[in-house]
Amino acid sequence: MTATPGLRFPLGATPLAAGTNFAVASSVAEGLELCLFDAAGEKARIPFLDVDAGVWHAFVPDVGPGQAYGLRATGPYRPADGIRCNPAKLLLDPYARAIHGDVTFGPEVLGYDPDRPDAPSSLDSASHVPRSLVVDPAFDWGTDVPRHRRLADSIVYELHVKGFTMAHPDVPPELRGTYAGLAHEAATSHLVDLGVTAVELLPVHRSVPEAFLVERGLTNYWGYNTIGFFAPHEGYSAAARAGDPLGAVREFKAMVLALHQAG
């Protein structure tokens, strides 16, 4: 599988008619590789051959929504300067719209050699970290438009998607703790009855629990340990729980639409 130069904007993975454009910003990498995965593991490794103004870009034919991918960077390793290029480590796309999988904590995910902290680790991390996913951005928003409500006329309610929906008795049990639960009429009607005009959600972007919590069989309830700001957290998606990782994106958008329709 080979790539053509592609475009340096927009950043991230953009599916097009005949393939997907990948654009990744790095001002320090001397080389960047795109790794494609299937259920059996890594199936292809494609070098980015073009870089403009610090953005590496490539168009890969016959790659579409749902494709799992990661990145590997070669270049300087100078931890004291905050530079840690290490091709043994599979990286997430910082602009990924979906991220699937969990971190398996161990020496493989460390960028450094535990026996020589100033040296890079040679252990491959691919089987221990999540993958980025190519996402189709299409969604039917209907006639939805921004409300442009004055702040003086607004009542903003801060809520936690899981906590709010888990505690609501009229949200169906199978939807509690999810975006679909917050989109349910029982949840939106409750907010309207309170006079709420906007919700401010506690972290809904993709996060992972810290290692010390995992060791204790716990998780991070609040979600501030972010690994991807543009990808919705899978753990709050009924669709992802049912085995559809891309469904988390659609479910999140449907939640936003339902909240807007409720006023």
Task: List PLM regions with ranges.
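Structural beta-strand segments of beta-rich domains
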Residues: 18-22
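Conserved, mostly hydrophobic/aromatic
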Residues: 24, 71, 159, 191, ...
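Aromatic- and acidic-residue-enriched carbohydrate-binding clefts of CAZyme catalytic domains
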Residues: 171-181, 211-261
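Carboxylate/His-rich catalytic cores and anion/metal-binding grooves
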Residues: 191-218
